[in-house]
Structures are given as structure tokens and as C-alpha cells.
Amino acid sequence: MTALVLGGCAAGSRGTDQAAEVSTTAKSILPAEHKDIAKGIYELAYSAKQDAVFVAVSGGFSKVPGKPMVARLNPQTLEVEKEIPLRRKAFGVALDDAKNRLYVGNTLDLSVTVVDIQRNRVVRTIQLMGKKKSANGRPAYTHDLRELVVDSANNRLYVTGHSEKGSVLFVVDTRRNRVIKTIPGLGNAKAPGLVLDAKGGLVFTSNLLGEVVVIDTKTQAVTQRFQTRSDQPMNIAYDSATQRLFITDQGLKMITDYQAKSIEGFKSRHPGKRILVLNANTGEEIKSVPVSDGPLALRLDEQRKRLYVTSRAGAQVSVFDSETYALLHSVNLPPFPQSIALDEARNVLFVTVKADTSKDGLAEDSVARIQLP
């Protein structure tokens, strides 16, 4: 908290020209309330069934770390109603609301903790891969975890394991709570993005080679690879009605410097700071939408045709019309807004906000609550 039929992608200046057509001025500034929760919070999920917000808490990495847990919040007041203790640091989350399960990514331990959100307790920890002998002779994990996504109907959990030497997709049987397949080919680079097309039986991932890699969930193999005109494709949202992919193209200098060192022959294709919109079937670039600095998480509300995007460096949440790409509203938050969850019934957005740790590392991260119009 981040690969056989080859698909083409539109290039040239098309995306740049289209970006200029989109207004970067919001019609209104929406208010937000936020509350400090704990050190080292990352992703969160809203459960309509439990009417609760669940937040992954790593405990942070300061000299005085907090305790890893899942914090259960009241969605109205943001008060912590329950702390579900974990043995391993928590980062990403995926919710299976129908089955009362929250899957929590333990990035540093290459595992997933399964939480029963009805009983507020840990059910099991799934080890995705063991340690291997590293270059210094010591055992170490070869991959990091980032995103998780659940296919509830088919009892599957998909988790990206990314590595410069070859990113993979872990496939977990959620009935047996065990890994049944490790799919290679997600690219020799970090693979941060992950989204599921449940109806089409496809998983889409992104990597820092600027690719979108498509996996068939039935054959459990990579079927397409799209080279995009982006450098840092991060999180992905999928619009099932129009078969479009929305991807945050981050544009951070720190990542650009990392790419220059780790990717042979790396040349920048785009400065980022935008939402890249692609045809999910062909990889064709449909639109390039400018957004505030450091875009990361997205949440698509297909029914209302709204797209919500966090910008970490820009300290904002932006609200777009997902059809016209017009910027409708913005929400000013403290640095650094990160992950998004949505209560669709109440039309309320929840956002994790990372504290500035550059001073003493003792500040707690917060969760913001935004009532949408």
C-alpha cells in the first residue's frame, strides 16, 4: 500500500488534446468531517450488511508503533466501536459482505488475514507463499502484496504479488482458505492495480511498465496485455455498463526516479497527474482527465455516474461525472488522502487520511466522512 494475445493501445497526442477539454475547476467545494483513528491506517471498506466501516491498521513504523488491528467504526460518528486485534500488520482490504468476511492483506508477511466481521474476530491467516533464500543468504519473501479483490459468487480472492523480477496474481479458494494458483506474467515491475470484471470473468492489473494485463478467471491465464501511454498506472476502477477502465496515473518524481534505476531503458511517456480512461476490450485510450497532484484511489458509483478520486499530494478528493468527465466537486482534506469506501444508500464517502510523519511520527491517521450531494 501494488501477464496470449497482445492488445494495441492508442498513442500519439490524442490523450493530451482531450485532457485540455476537461474543466479543472470544481463547481463546488464539499465539506468533510474527520476523526483521528490510529497510527498507520491504510485501506477501508464499508459494509452495508453490518452498517459499519472497517479500517486496516498497520500500527505504523515509528519508534513507538501502534498495534495492528482492524478498526470497526460507526459510519455516522466515526467512533471506534470495536478493535479486532491482528498478529500481522494490515494494509489492503477486500470485503465479501454477503459472507461476512473481510480479507486483509499483510504486505510484509505475504499473507492474508481472514476476519469474520459479524463476530469481530480473526478466522484464519492464509500464507500465500513462503520465504526463499535471498542474495545475502537469508530467507526472505520475494514479493510484496498490494491490492485484493473478491469474487463472492465464485468463492475466489485475487491478490497481486508484485516484484521487479516478475509480478504474480495469487488465486485463493475462499471456501478452503488456501492458494490454488499463482499466475505469473504480470510484468517484471511492481504491479499496483487490480480490479475484477465479475460478469466477464476477467481480472485487470496494472504495472510500472505502463501496462494493463488481463487475466481470464476461468483459464487462470493471461490473455491480453495493453501498453498504455502512462508511466505510473496505479489503482483501477471498472465500469461494467460501458466496459471502460479508469486508472490513476500518479506522476510522482520519487516513482519516476525508481523506474529510471530499476527498469532498463526506461523513458517517460507522460507526466501523469491524471485519470486515464481506456476501452477495457481493446486498451484504446478514450480520455485523459487532469486531476490534482498524486492521484491514487478511485471509486466508481455506476448508478449515479460519479467517479471519486483521492489526490495525496493535492490533499483533495475530486468528484467527476463519469460520463462527461467534468469535475463537479472537490473536497479539501489534510495531507494525505489515500483510500476510498462508499455507502451507496446514504451517498456518503469515507476516506483514509495519512498524517504527516516527517516531524515525529507520532501523529495518528484519520478517516474523513463526506456527505455527497
Could you tell me what each predicted segment is?
Residues 9-373:
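Predominantly soluble domains enriched in secretory-pathway, periplasmic, or organellar proteins
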Residues 1-10:
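Gram-negative bacterial Sec-dependent N-terminal signal peptides
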